[in-house]
Amino acid sequence: MILGIESSCDDSSIALMDIDNFELKKYKKITQENEHSKFGGVVPELAARLHTAAIPNLIEDVKEFFTSIKAVAVTNEPGLSVSLISGVSAARALSLALGIPLIGVNHLIGHIYSLFLDKNVVLPLGVLLVSGGHTMVLNIDESGYIKLIATTSDDSFGESFDKVAKMMDLGYPGGAIIEKLALSGDKNRFNFTVPLKHDKRLEYSFSGLKNQVRTQISKFESLSLQDKSDIASSFQYTAISHITDKLEKIFSEYKFKNFGAIGGGSANQVLRSNLEQICEKFGSNLMFAPLKFCSDNAAMIARAGVCKYKNKCFTKPLDMSINPRCKLDGANLYF
């Protein structure tokens, strides 16, 4: 089995996966959402302290399987430095103590494996990545080579939801809160402009939309629940229109045979519905990760670890480092 550890941001998670059939033998996740919600976002120092408390307890839960673990896979890039260190330190110690290989996993590439938790990797593949501070469209060819097609020039899809939620004192994380509030809102009440609508560049930008929302909110002395619902609905509609508007242009050029949406943002049901329409229009096979595994989790890290284990992609424990920022363009997906 492969042991996966994930601690790139504000979730501590551990997973055990069978190398041969990808069966998830054990999975547990400890979220820090309640602790960070009062601050309207993730506080790095608090995240580090909570990881330090949670990870030893998670490892204790899989102690009975130690003799069956063939390698430990851990997220070592990208993410919050203080959070990455917590997971990598634990993984390094386990590798040395158990005498098993250590595997470093790129967190964003890990999300790609969330599409294939219980099956073999399918290539070629187009990907919409909407995870935390990242919004990207990727093309992965038959060899696993990853090409970046589009990214954001400022705020990400997820960050814009978090910031709009904070503007209305709704709590953190903003994605699920805005989506739920939007259900009872009127998406046509506020006519927010879709960013870069007539710009031919394959690029995303959410800061302008965020500022449109802030300007609208400033016009109110106080916001009623209905006002908040209408703002949430109008904002969500415009943000997703921005995603799909650029995707239509990308699909026209790339003709994806398979397409997957990954990351916490891909759990949004309105976005999923829009992606279904696009993929039906262009004849692309659409894939999603199970809702439980859209957000950060160790199952996807273990799944990536299985592929890297089979390809003998190991790192010496004392040589493993963390990388808070990294590029996906030119990276490879193992299968």
Curated annotation (Swiss-Prot):
It comes from the Bacteria. The keyword Zinc-finger does not apply. It holds the Pfam family TsaD. Its cofactor is Fe(2+). PROSITE patterns: GLYCOPROTEASE. GO terms for molecular function: iron ion binding; N(6)-L-threonylcarbamoyladenine synthase activity. It is found in: Cytoplasm. It catalyses: L-threonylcarbamoyladenylate + adenosine(37) in tRNA = N(6)-L-threonylcarbamoyladenosine(37) in tRNA + AMP + H(+). One of its GO terms (cellular component) is cytoplasm. GO terms for biological process: tRNA threonylcarbamoyladenosine modification. Coiled coil: none annotated. Substrate binds at L129, V130, S131, G132, G133, D162, G175, N268. Keywords: Acyltransferase, Cytoplasm, Iron, Metal-binding, Transferase, tRNA processing. Binds 1 Fe(2+) ion per subunit. InterPro entries: ATPase_NBD (IPR043129), Gcp-like_dom (IPR000905), KAE1/TsaD (IPR017861), Peptidase_M22_CS (IPR017860), TsaD (IPR022450). Its EC number is 2.3.1.234. Fe cation binds at H107, H111, D296. Belongs to the KAE1 / TsaD family. Required for the formation of a threonylcarbamoyl group on adenosine at position 37 (t(6)A37) in tRNAs that read codons beginning with adenine. Is involved in the transfer of the threonylcarbamoyl moiety of threonylcarbamoyl-AMP (TC-AMP) to the N6 group of A37, together with TsaE and TsaB. TsaD likely plays a direct catalytic role in this reaction. This is tRNA N6-adenosine threonylcarbamoyltransferase.
